Amino acid sequence: MKHFLRMLIQVCLYFYCKFLWRCLKFVMRKLTGRCELQRICYNTKPGASRTMKIETSLRDSKSKLLQTSVSVHPDAIEKTIEDIMELKKINPDVNPQLGISLQACLLQIVGYRNLIADVEKLRREAYDSDNPQHEEMLLKLWKFLKPNTPLESRISKQWCEIGFQGDDPKTDFRGMGLLGLYNLQYFAERDATAAQQVLSDSLHPKCRDITKEEISKFSKAEWEKKRMDKAIGYSFAIVGINITDLAYNLLVSGALKTHFYNIAPEAPTLSHFQQTFCYLMHEFHKFWIEEDPMDIMEFNRVREKFRKRIIKQLQNPDMALCPHFAASEGLINM
């Protein structure tokens, strides 16, 4: 009974707040002579702040036209803007900038949805060793990361040198499908210097000094074992696939809207997503070294802490993950 009453109160509060919000919108329109979309465009600077407010306004509207506008085909955006202006009785000759601002926002909103679909398609496509294109991408990954070391054979223990778990990398792509390979190749090709440096660090990590306090807790045998385990390296390719999973979840959850709406003046593309992966890979490597973990068994703890830090950064509406490496030179700031 208590649960039912609690649910009933929550439902009543929801509709009450919704009613008050509609009343406020009506009063604001009468006072300013502008609809909510106009007020947002005129009072909010371009970027994530404006686009996310426009997106919320369109989705929460009682108008079917406005609700469906966030999922129209990119080619239909211009016509959709005209229909919205007509519905809101806004003269485009008197308010020419409004149409331009709304179009920019819709391009980002629709583009983000389409980007999720593109990324999901790659994630669902399994690596196929009988597919020449898949094989070519994998071999290119080796060449970009190990340009001076020829691969002796397709099935080889050499793959472990770039962080795969066995002698055939295809089994490591099961979780993220082709998306993991696409991201790794992009990083290795577009930011070769940084990728090779990260790989080198992962293979030849700095040693972690054990403090006297830590030594006192171990027996001689335990200390000798700990002394041998204190390196902080990791498997480059496996971590890259794991960071791909992180980037994917940030995208699908909507957390990356802040970043993409601030750096992509129109529709965010797969290249923007791959550049974001490069940034995350670069930052995670620095974060891993700063955290100074005892061994690879602490990976999940460090990754979760890193994820929370990125999410906190993305909660800032002005946030754009900094393009400070070669792969992101093409990013355009708004």
From Swiss-Prot:
Residues 133-314 form the ELMO domain. The keyword Ribosomal protein does not apply. GO terms for cellular component: cilium; glutamatergic synapse; Golgi apparatus. GO terms for biological process: cilium assembly; protein transport. PROSITE patterns: ELMO. Keywords: GTPase activation. GO terms for molecular function: GTPase activator activity. It comes from the Eukaryota. PANTHER family: ELMO DOMAIN-CONTAINING PROTEIN 1, ENGULFMENT AND CELL MOTILITY. Acts as a GTPase-activating protein (GAP) toward guanine nucleotide exchange factors like ARL2, ARL3, ARF1 and ARF6, but not for GTPases outside the Arf family. This is ELMO domain-containing protein 1. It comes from Homo sapiens. The lineage of its organism: Eukaryota, Metazoa, Chordata, Craniata, Vertebrata.
